[in-house]
């Protein structure tokens, strides 16, 4: 859950990533436990973290859709920044270094060296322009896709394609979905069309406190719903 996301954690290997592909389902579930426990640990009000765990598909949807039966934890968008601050301070106190206002410009895989350049030299906290590593995790968001592609092409790094999911977001009054919400706060409906080789699923339902944030990437606009916990944000959407 990013700092501007819907503040929910899906507890299953079938949605949200390929972790089990690399470490197996059992280890993936163990790591998910660690993530959820840390979100509670650094939450200013951990007692408000809500778990929705449907145990059976309701009869009224069976002719049309299936329902994923696994837990979803609602942390709350309005708490994510404070959780991030607490988590950050814990890492700093443990000796982890963060380098701000700096940008990775290259990686030398022969010398195990990450090359930096300062974006705003007056604010950077780096003493050197490179860092040596024993092991490197290269994790970038959408804004780093081009840089990742440049590195892969420059050093002939092996890559593999990832499936693409296309989503459409719409807002509707909560009353139209209340029967489903009573079964599962963040209900996950799905339907497979085997003859077409495609499937549909619902995701990111932000019930009774839905706010939409716009994100601009490469000239396109995408939207991400917020699911806030504080009752004062409730808007019946």
Model regions and ranges:
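Residues forming the flavin
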Residues: 1-22, 49-237
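Conserved catalytic/binding loops enriched for acidic/polar residues
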Residues: 23, 27-42
